[in-house]
C-alpha cells in the first residue's frame, strides 16, 4: 500500500490505515496495484474517504511518480488508471485471502483486517 502522510516513515513501519482508492499499473512482472491509504489516527488525513477527497494535484504527482520511477532501470511501466475505495477494498480482500492461505507464515508480525 501507499500511505499518505506528512512526515517520513521508515521501512517496516506498521500503522493502522484505511484504503481510499487504488492506482492500477503494470510492470514487467505483471499487474502491480498500489492501494492508496490514509492513517486512521492522523486527524489531517483520516477525514479522506475516497480519492475524490484528495487534492487533484497530489493524484497527478502520484501518477507521474509511478510513470517514471523505473526509467533509470530502462523498464517500462503501464499506467492503467484509478479505482475507487470499493475496488481498493476488493483488492485488499483478495490479498488477505492469499496471505491467509500461505502455509508456515510467520505469526504475530501484523494483522490484516
Task: Show where each model-derived region lies.
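Hydrophobic N-terminal alpha-helices or hydrophobic patches in metabolic proteins across all domains
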Residues: 1-113
Amino acid at each position: 500500500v501507499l500511505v499518505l502522510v506528512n512526515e517520513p516513515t521508515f521501512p517496516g513501519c506498521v500503522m493502522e490505515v484505511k484504503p481510499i482508492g487504488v492506482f492500477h499499473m503494470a510492470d514487467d512482472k505483471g499487474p502491480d496495484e498500489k492501494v492508496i491509504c490514509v492513517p486512521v489516527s492522523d486527524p489531517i488525513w483520516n477525514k479522506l474517504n475516497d480519492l475524490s477527497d484528495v487534492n487533484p494535484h497530489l493524484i497527478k504527482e502520484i501518477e507521474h511518480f509511478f510513470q517514471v520511477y523505473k526509467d533509470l532501470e530502462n523498464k517500462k511501466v503501464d499506467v492503467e488508471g484509478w479505482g475507487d475505495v470499493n475496488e481498493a477494498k476488493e483488492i485488499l480482500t483478495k490479498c488477505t485471502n492469499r496471505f491467509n492461505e500461505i502455509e508456515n507464515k510467520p505469526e504475530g508480525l501484523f494483522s490484516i483486517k
